[in-house]
Design a protein with these regions (language model features):
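Phosphate-binding loop of NTP-binding sites
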Residues: 1-130, 134, 138-151
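Short, surface-exposed amphipathic charged segments that create phosphate/polyanion-binding patches used
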Residues: 47-49, 110, 162-177
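Beta-strand->loop->alpha-helix junctions that form or flank phosphate-binding loops
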Residues: 147-170
Length: 185
């Protein structure tokens, strides 16, 4: 099972959080690829060089994780990963779109917001299930694209009337997640 996160902000934190929760629940069977480090055996973390590794490195790392009996991979998927075909041919079981803002518009990265959005939204083409922030400025576009491609869409957000899953932040880092639809996974 491969879970990929994209977003201008929050990819690394979300990957760490997800891997930690999954490892607590499932044991040492969760690999991680992030901009900070990589874990291919469920225990050992080594420094990373890119947010998303180059294609050949990525697939080599995935093979190593499988050889190490990893059943899950939680990873960051940057806009550059799609722009430079680093994740070409990589299907995601779950793609998570956190947010988008014009931080990476430049001659070096993306010439326009439209190019940036197009690259980031490729996660929809490559995932089976899209989990998307209901409060993302491009939510309607992303959800429509996913529905047009026949993808399941699950939303999250703090607005209880709009998202499938709602969160409420408490004190000291505590939070509560609720859903009005018990049929959702």
């Amino acid at each position: 099972t491969v879970i990929g996160y994209t977003g201008t902000k929050g990819k690394t934190t979300s990957v760490y959080f997800t891997r930690h929760v999954m490892a607590k629940a499932l044991g040492k069977v969760v690999a991680q690829l992030s901009s900070i480090d990589e874990c291919l055996d469920g225990e050992t973390f080594i420094p990373a060089h890119l947010t998303t590794p180059e294609s050949l490195d990525l697939f080599r790392m995935m093979k190593e994780a499988v050889d190490n009996q990893m059943k899950y991979l939680v990873m960051e998927v940057s806009s550059q990963a799609y722009k430079k075909s680093r994740v070409f041919g990589l299907p995601l079981d779950i793609g998570v779109f956190l947010n988008i803002s014009p931080d990476h518009i430049s001659p070096v990265e993306h010439p326009s917001f439209e190019d940036y959005l197009a690259c980031k939204s490729e996660i929809i083409d490559n995932c089976r299930i899209l989990v998307v922030n209901r409060e993302c400025s491009q939510y309607d576009y992303l959800a429509e694209k996913a529905h047009d491609l026949g993808k399941q869409v699950i939303s999250f957000g703090s607005d209880q009337s709009a998202a499938d899953y709602q969160y409420r932040l408490g004190e000291h880092g505590h939070f509560t997640v609720t859903t009005a639809n018990p049929a959702l996974p």
